[in-house]
């Protein structure tokens, strides 16, 4: 039989594979974070019909004569170039800008994906559409310990941030320098005890006969337990500041008066606690560019709950596709190197966006034409070889 017949068959098979790869790329043009593939060809064994001959003093050397035996698929590579961004506005949609992969766990197997379309399930775990659980590091008392063993990223449903006792409060704003002597301003601030119970601390500001001066004391407190506020002056007169402001304590709360001013006309003094809060329950959450899941509590407090892990590979092209836009590590990809979003080589996260497919339709349709024409050309090899064989069989007539 003619060798060209089998060469044509190998060409059909190889170009059919190219058509399959190209068709799959086009089919996934709108698949989240899909990475296009490409088929590479190489020739097969060649039959040596004449060996090379070395040069002699009386004759020149001769090159080997070889007849190729067709083509085969050398490999199918994956293009891991960054896809474009698609804004979704959904807080659990995450896009990686960089080379990292999300780490997921499904059925006891660790998988890796670029597709950041996530949801929280009924158990509060962050999962992919097919149920793989996103992995990362949990937080203890709001502090994430990176670098250890990873676990499920989850929202602790019904979580409570404990109450914290108030220890300090700050009064700021303006005490009017043109207020009448003896006039008073009463201002309050709410503080918390160890159990989160709220109570009110009240201060009375009294205008003194000292130029632009005031005294401050606890409302209803002893007259001796007051602080004198003396207006500060320079060569041009009053500066609007109080000199040598000394804080004091009221019922165990340190009062800070350093932000008070003394300009005319305005009475804007107000108090605020520097710390302390009542107990709060988890209301909502945010996801940051560094992968930190932050819980927002009913008492206004924010606390880190966990941080999403990202993985990189020495050879991402060695990853094996596992379906559902996921990959698994192989011997040739190397082991996963874990880190936090924002670290070198891993990339940062964007919440409310997804990475689009990196399929280039213009390139894929060109590849489709090339594969089709290659298939047709190899089919002609077979039909032509068949005609030659037909002529051979007709020689007997």
Q: What kind of region is each of these model predictions?
A:
Residues 2, 28, 35-367, 374:
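Small/polar low-complexity and glycine-rich loop motifs
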Residues 12, 16-19, 368, 375, ...:
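Hydrophobic a/d positions of heptad-repeat alpha-helices that form coiled-coil
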Residues 24, 373-376, 380:
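Core alpha-helical elements of the protein kinase catalytic domain
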Residues 388-397:
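Structured functional modules or segments
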């Amino acid at each position: 039989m003619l060798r060209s017949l089998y060469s044509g068959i190998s060409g059909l098979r190889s170009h059919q594979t190219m058509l399959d790869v190209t068709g799959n790329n086009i089919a996934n043009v709108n698949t989240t974070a899909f990475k296009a593939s490409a088929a590479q060809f190489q020739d097969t064994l060649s039959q040596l019909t004449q060996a090379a001959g070395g040069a002699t003093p009386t004759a020149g050397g001769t090159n080997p004569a070889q007849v190729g035996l067709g083509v085969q698929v050398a490999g199918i590579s994956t293009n891991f170039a960054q896809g474009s961004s698609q804004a979704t506005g959904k807080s659990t949609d995450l896009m990686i800008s960089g080379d990292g992969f999300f780490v997921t766990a499904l059925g006891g197997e660790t998988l890796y994906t670029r597709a950041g379309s996530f949801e929280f399930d009924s158990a509060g775990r962050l999962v992919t559409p097919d149920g793989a659980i996103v992995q990362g590091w949990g937080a203890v008392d709001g502090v994430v310990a990176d670098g250890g063993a990873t676990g499920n990223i989850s929202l602790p449903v019904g979580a409570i941030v404990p109450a914290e006792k108030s220890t300090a409060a700050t009064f700021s704003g303006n005490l009017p320098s043109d207020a009448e002597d003896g006039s008073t301003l009463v201002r309050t601030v709410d503080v918390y005890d160890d159990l989160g119970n709220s109570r009110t601390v009240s201060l009375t500001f009294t205008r003194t006969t000292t130029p632009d001066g005031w005294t401050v004391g606890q409302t209803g407190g002893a007259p001796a337990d007051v602080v004198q506020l003396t207006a500060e002056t320079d060569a041009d007169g009053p500066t609007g500041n109080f000199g040598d402001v000394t804080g004091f304590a009221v019922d165990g709360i340190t009062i800070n008066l350093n932000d008070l001013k003394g300009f005319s006309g305005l009475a804007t003094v107000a108090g605020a606690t520097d710390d302390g809060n009542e107990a709060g329950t988890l209301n909502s959450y945010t996801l940051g560019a560094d992968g930190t899941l932050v819980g927002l509590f009913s008492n206004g407090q924010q606390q880190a709950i966990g941080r999403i892990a990202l993985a990189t590979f020495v050879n991402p092209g060695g990853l094996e596709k596992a379906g559902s836009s996921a990959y698994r590590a192989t011997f040739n990809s190397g082991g996963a190197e874990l880190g936090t979003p924002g670290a070198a080589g891993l990339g940062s996260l964007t919440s409310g966006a997804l990475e689009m497919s990196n399929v280039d339709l213009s390139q894929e349709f060109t590849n489709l034409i090339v594969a089709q024409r290659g298939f047709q050309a190899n089919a002609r090899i077979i039909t032509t070889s068949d005609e030659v064989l037909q002529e051979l069989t007709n020689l007997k007539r």
